[in-house]
């Protein structure tokens, strides 16, 4: 049973890469995501996605090499456009209708400009909307972009698919085998404990707009469906 009707999925760009095969985009993973979205949409759930660009570009390391932060962030925005177009193609191959909407001005042959009314129309028609370009401004993360878009389209929940991490812990589980996993936690507790889930702007915005957050391991089989149905190890963050 899925209790949400409109969701936003936050996918990290880094999670798309297949380092073993030396691929920037793992299309096998894209196909697995697409097959899950088909099932979810058939159940009446409206799906939007915000994708990062970390598989192509890491802005923090760029700054260390003399590239100004604002320019590095714009390069990162272009990286999200590439990921969004790749997702769109993978989804369409699976029989889904998908749109890419960009928060930065880009040739309309490549992607549409983001217009809220159009987004809602597409979602109501059962199409997947992929948001690219982050917030369109430097100094903001794609986590903040995800929360911003979720608030604008009135999504009830953000699904944050992590790479081999199945939720929120009190410390890094990859470094501390005794890290404590939270099945449920509030945004205020995250802020108080200074847990690295989303940046402070995104966390506060999600809390203030009463948007739930589900953090789960994207790489598990049928993870998106199971996360929505509560049948996978995850963390639910609420106000």
From Swiss-Prot:
Where does the protein principally reside? cytoplasm
GO MF: ATP binding; UMP kinase activity
Which pathway is recorded for this entry? Pyrimidine metabolism; CTP biosynthesis via de novo pathway; UDP from UMP (UMPK route): step 1/1
Q: Which reaction does it catalyse?
A: UMP + ATP = UDP + ADP
List residues binding ATP: 10-13, 54, 58, 163, 169, 172
Q: Name one GO cellular component term.
A: cytoplasm
Q: Which enzyme class, named as a word?
A: transferase
GO BP annotations of the record are: 'de novo' CTP biosynthetic process; UDP biosynthetic process
Summarize the activity regulation: Inhibited by UTP.
Localization per Swiss-Prot or TrEMBL: Cytoplasm
Any single Pfam family the record assigns to this protein: AA_kinase
Q: Which UniProt keywords apply?
A: ATP-binding, Cytoplasm, Kinase, Nucleotide-binding, Pyrimidine biosynthesis, Transferase
Self-association state and partner proteins as the record states? Homohexamer.
PANTHER family per the UniProt record, alphabetical: URIDYLATE KINASE, URIDYLATE KINASE PUMPKIN, CHLOROPLASTIC
Q: Which family does it belong to?
A: Belongs to the UMP kinase family.
UniProt name for this protein? Uridylate kinase
Species name: Mycoplasmopsis synoviae (strain 53) (Mycoplasma synoviae)
């Amino acid at each position: 049973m899925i209790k949400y009707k409109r969701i936003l999925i936050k996918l990290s760009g880094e999670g798309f890469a297949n380092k073993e095969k030396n691929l920037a985009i793992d299309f096998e993973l894209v196909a697995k995501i697409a097959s899950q979205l088909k099932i979810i949409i058939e159940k009446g759930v409206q799906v939007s996605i915000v994708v990062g660009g970390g598989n192509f570009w890491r802005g923090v390391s760029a700054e260390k090499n003399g590239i100004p932060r604002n320019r590095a962030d714009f390069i990162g925005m272009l990286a999200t456009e590439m990921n969004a177009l790749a997702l769109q193609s993978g989804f369409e191959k699976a029989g889904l209708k998908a749109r890419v909407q960009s928060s930065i001005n880009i040739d309309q042959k490549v992607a549409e400009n983001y217009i809220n009314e159009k987004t809602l129309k597409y979602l109501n028609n059962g199409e997947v909307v992929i948001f690219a370009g982050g917030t369109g401004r430097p100094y903001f993360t794609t986590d903040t972009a995800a929360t911003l878009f979720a608030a604008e389209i009135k999504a009830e929940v953000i699904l944050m698919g992590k790479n081999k991490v199945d939720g929120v812990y009190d410390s890094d589980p990859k470094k501390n085998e005794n890290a404590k996993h939270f099945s449920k936690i509030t945004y205020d507790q995250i802020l108080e404990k200074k847990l690295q889930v989303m940046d402070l702007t995104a966390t506060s915005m999600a809390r203030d707009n009463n948007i739930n957050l589900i953090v789960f391991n994207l790489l598990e089989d049928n993870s998106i469906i199971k996360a929505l149905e509560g049948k996978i190890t995850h963390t639910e963050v609420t106000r």
